[in-house]
């Protein structure tokens, strides 16, 4: 609404009275409050221009306590490793807090293949004059079965299905077994996709 947009402008202009929590949706706010309580942290309301001290990651489970028996299925999901999330933050320790680069980092982390939620908030640092970053993420369920087919007349002109792990070993890499058939050929084999080769924003795709 108008109030949120006014607050967004205030924060973008780095003005006093900026409330970063007011810019979050309900699910994001709840996740951040839970992470703050878990780590004993407090929001830094004026991080701009301060050097970054630490980057701390809290990665929430796919199924939360409120989802009852579904929590059992968490054992079949490899939660994204903290170091994998941490390296996506473009502002590095020792550099000044830059909200534009923080926002870009958040957009990278919110890749829907891997995350349903990603928030980066400034928190008070133990180092005088510095600010720490608290990164809160929540994975999506990563085991997938995909199927696609096209029919011409009474036969398949194209057929493919795959079983994939979209977050292999918690590394944000995709590994799949794929069957693919068209009118001219049949193929079966593994598929590997890495969207962050050697920590850089390159994509590696191989079959």
PLM regions with names:
Residues 1-207:
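Immediate N-terminus of the mature polypeptide
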